[in-house]
Amino acid sequence: MSEEKPKEGVKTENDHINLKVAGQDGSVVQFKIKRHTPLSKLMKAYCERQGLSMRQIRFRFDGQPINETDTPAQLEMEDEDTIDVFQQQTGGSASRGSVPTPNRCPDLCY
């Protein structure tokens, strides 16, 4: 018996990659995606599964932001690599009462 080689144009298991998406809460969701499929597909599926909006979170791989048009092949991702998910930080104002006001701090000059 001779060993058959995959023919040109025939899809093999190497066309797919298994990726882990790790949330800040420690949860991990696994996805199987084609190496040349835009990661937007994975990102949208993750958001739907977790009940999140794409505007609420950011995806990073090796510390770098991931764009929706990026593919695993472009980012040189390997099987079982992990994508990190971070909640989008909005605002930055101090909470009410944390900044002294003249009524609360009569000894301070403004």
UniProtKB/Swiss-Prot annotation:
Residues 93-110 form a propeptide. It holds the Pfam family Rad60-SLD. This is Small ubiquitin-related modifier 3. There is a cross-link at K11 (Glycyl lysine isopeptide (Lys-Gly) (interchain with G-Cter in SUMO)). It comes from the Eukaryota. Polymeric chains can be formed through Lys-11 cross-linking. Cleavage of precursor form by SENP1, SENP2 or SENP5 is necessary for function. Interacts with SAE2 and UBE2I. Covalently attached to a number of proteins. Interacts with USP25 (via ts SIM domain); the interaction sumoylates USP25 and inhibits its ubiquitin hydrolyzing activity. Interacts with BMAL1. Residues 88-110 are annotated as: Disordered. Residues 88-101 have a biased composition (Polar residues). GO terms for cellular component: glutamatergic synapse; nuclear body; nucleoplasm; PML body; postsynaptic cytosol; presynaptic cytosol. Gene3D superfamilies: Phosphatidylinositol 3-kinase Catalytic Subunit, Chain A, domain 1 (3.10.20.90). GO terms for molecular function: SUMO transferase activity. Residues 15-92 form the Ubiquitin-like domain. There is a cross-link at G92 (Glycyl lysine isopeptide (Gly-Lys) (interchain with K-? in acceptor proteins)). It is found in: Cytoplasm; Nucleus; Nucleus, PML body. Disulfide bonds: none annotated.
